[in-house]
């Protein structure tokens, strides 16, 4: 068995190492000894192009996988996801203060950000929030005003609906 090394900057950068090692059987017969090939060291030279072709194929597969994984971040931008997460954490914190309890003890309150973003006006959004917070005994006006301010400029994360023609 001969050893061929091949390196590529993309392969090395992806795995964190420099050169990659590939094991390739010699071409000159099934279990031959090193002396059975026509020239000394020729099996290593013959297998090197095969190993680099295999390395190129693996690099191409890794790039395709990265491209497929990248589709998720194209559909849902990481920056938008982070903004959404920060907003949701802020909402949970504010609801805890409004209801005067921990998250586990909080009554079931559903605030759908995408639903709010679908609303045509701030008045409609405020109305939906007031309906969701009807059981809250503390004043909710400040929370509603701040939430409406925070969602301004955000985009919906739900997949777009197909329009019927």
From Swiss-Prot:
Its main location: cytoplasm. SUPFAM superfamilies: Myosin phosphatase inhibitor 17kDa protein, CPI-17. InterPro entries: CPI-17 (IPR008025), CPI-17_sf (IPR036658). It is a peripheral membrane protein. Pfam families: PP1_inhibitor. The modification Omega-N-methylarginine is found at residue 27. Keywords: Acetylation, Cytoplasm, Membrane, Methylation, Phosphoprotein, Protein phosphatase inhibitor. Has over 600-fold higher inhibitory activity when phosphorylated, creating a molecular switch for regulating the phosphorylation status of PPP1CA substrates and smooth muscle contraction. The main inhibitory site appears to be Thr-73. Residues 1-73 are annotated as: Disordered. One of its GO terms (cellular component) is membrane. It is found in: Cytoplasm; Membrane. The modification Phosphothreonine is found at residue 73. Residues 1-12, 35-63 have a biased composition (Low complexity). GO terms for molecular function: protein serine/threonine phosphatase inhibitor activity. The modification Phosphoserine is found at residues 25, 33. The modification N-acetylserine is found at residue 2. Detected in breast cancer. Belongs to the PP1 inhibitor family. Inhibitor of the PP1 regulatory subunit PPP1CA. This is Protein phosphatase 1 regulatory subunit 14C.
């Amino acid at each position: 068995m001969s050893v061929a090394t091949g390196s590529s900057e993309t392969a090395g950068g992806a795995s964190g190492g420099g050169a990659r090692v590939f094991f390739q059987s010699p071409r000159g017969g099934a279990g031959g000894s090193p002396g059975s090939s026509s020239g000394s060291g020729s099996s290593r030279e013959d297998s090197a192009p095969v190993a680099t072709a295999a390395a190129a194929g693996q690099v191409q597969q890794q790039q395709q996988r990265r491209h497929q994984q990248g589709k998720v971040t194209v559909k849902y931008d990481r920056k938008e996801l982070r903004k959404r997460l920060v907003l949701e954490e802020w909402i949970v914190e504010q609801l805890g203060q409004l209801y005067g309890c921990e998250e586990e003890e909080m009554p079931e309150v559903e605030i759908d950000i995408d639903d709010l973003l679908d609303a045509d006006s701030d008045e409609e959004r405020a109305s939906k929030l007031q309906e969701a917070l009807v059981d809250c005994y503390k004043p909710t006006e400040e929370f509603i005003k701040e939430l409406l301010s925070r969602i301004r400029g955000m985009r919906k994360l739900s997949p777009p609906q197909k329009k019927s023609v």
